């Protein structure tokens, strides 16, 4: 017996207040959620039908002011900010481009909430953190950004859980570092905290924008979801790129009077010839923090980058909505590429969904990071 068709609904909302303004019949939709990134949304809206134009879609999708929500069978699965629209008169279609709520914080700078643009010297202000848990730092970066007049888009922390990793960080006002960049840099540190901004319906039935911060990881570990090729795993790609590998990494810090601060991390047990690269963190003045960045960068480039993409069934266990970015998964494959058969652990780092314009067209593509020891 065929199940009930999956229903997608697309809502517009006011970015500042969060109030839903209308529902639009979008099609050719694709949206993605990424760990420690914003994720994207693309869709088209036909304007030739008077039943649609009466909703005044141009006003509903004003870039930088409008938000979008995606609801799947009554559950919010995506939300973000409309940044681009493009109308084409030839086919009377409006193309809409949006990015997750994290993208808003790419347009904000790490400055104290009391910063007065009319009378404050940037060189005299900073946002400091001394021996603070890194998960608290992530939450505070978002809170400080939203404490500025007109800067609150109602993203609230889901919890106050701590990671047990403390850090001392200072964000000078003169750096004008974006809040989004500060969050990503924090996550990229060795044992740095994962983060994602998602949404759910609150007790009053209205969407709630949530900042979830890992301790340090997000997601479900230890009891992985399982995808098997030929069953709930429809297809996969297996790209391996060794062009950027290195066994020795130089991390370059601030240039001071006595020269540039440099940290080096090396792995001599890869079985590969020595290769070298460098990464730049010219704003860093803390030697230990720079060493952490060097080790983190080395871990990312010490072996060929393998980022498989899995095309999975949305309607078979584990069904779409039962897993999220950060979760562990087990992949089972036996085919001409792995003729002996193999299974390996991965971590979900991206989920891209194409709902389809008709029933039965829903597609889900997962980007995963293989665990150590993957074939």
Model-found features: residue ranges?
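Well-ordered beta-strand positions in beta-sheet-rich domains
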Residues: 76-81, 95, 224-226, 343-347, ...
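Beta-strand-rich assembly/attachment modules of structural machines
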Residues: 1-130
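Short beta-strand micro-motifs in enzyme catalytic cores
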Residues: 92-96, 207-209, 247, 362-364
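Short, surface-exposed beta-strand/loop "edge" segments at domain boundaries and coil↔beta transitions
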Residues: 16-20, 49-53, 76-78, 103-107, ...
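Charged- and aromatic-enriched interaction segments used to assemble
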Residues: 101-241
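Short beta-strand micro-motifs enriched in acidic
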Residues: 34, 85-88, 198-200, 354-356
């Amino acid at each position: 017996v065929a199940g009930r068709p999956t229903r997608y609904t697309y809502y517009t909302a006011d970015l500042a207040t969060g109030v839903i303004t209308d529902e639009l019949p979008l099609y050719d939709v694709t949206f993605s959620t990424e760990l420690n990134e914003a994720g994207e949304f693309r869709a088209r809206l036909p304007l030739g039908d008077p039943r649609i134009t009466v909703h005044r879609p141009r006003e509903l999708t004003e870039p930088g002011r409008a938000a979008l929500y995606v609801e799947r069978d009554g559950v919010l699965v995506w939300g973000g900010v409309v940044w681009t629209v493009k109308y084409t008169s030839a086919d009377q279609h409006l193309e809409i481009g949006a990015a997750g709520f994290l993208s808003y914080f790419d347009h904000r700078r790490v400055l104290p909430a009391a910063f007065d643009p009319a009378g404050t010297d940037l060189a005299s202000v900073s946002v400091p953190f001394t021996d603070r848990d890194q998960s608290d730092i992530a939450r505070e970066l978002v809170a400080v950004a939203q404490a500025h007049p007109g800067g609150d888009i109602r993203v609230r922390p889901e919890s106050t859980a701590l990671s047990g990793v403390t850090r001392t960080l200072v964000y000078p006002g003169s750096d004008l570092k974006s809040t989004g960049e500060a969050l990503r840099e924090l996550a990229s540190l060795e044992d740095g905290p994962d983060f994602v901004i998602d949404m759910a319906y609150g007790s009053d039935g209205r969407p709630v924008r949530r900042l979830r911060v890992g301790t340090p990881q997000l997601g479900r570990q230890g009891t992985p979801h399982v995808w098997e090729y030929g069953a709930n795993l429809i297809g996969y790609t297996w790209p391996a790129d060794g062009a950027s590998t290195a066994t020795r990494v130089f991390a370059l810090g601030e240039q001071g009077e006595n020269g540039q601060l440099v940290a080096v991390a090396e792995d001599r047990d890869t079985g590969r010839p020595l290769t070298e690269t460098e990464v730049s963190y010219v704003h860093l003045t803390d030697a230990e923090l720079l060493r952490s960045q060097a080790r983190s960068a080395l871990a990312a480039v010490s072996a060929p980058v393998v980022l498989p993409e899995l095309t999975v069934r949305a309607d078979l266990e584990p069904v779409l909505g039962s897993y999220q970015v950060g979760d562990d998964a087990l992949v089972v494959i036996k085919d001409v590429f792995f003729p002996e058969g193999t299974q390996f652990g991965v971590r979900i780092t991206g989920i891209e969904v194409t709902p389809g314009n008709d029933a039965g067209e829903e597609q889900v593509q997962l980007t995963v990071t293989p665990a150590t020891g993957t074939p």
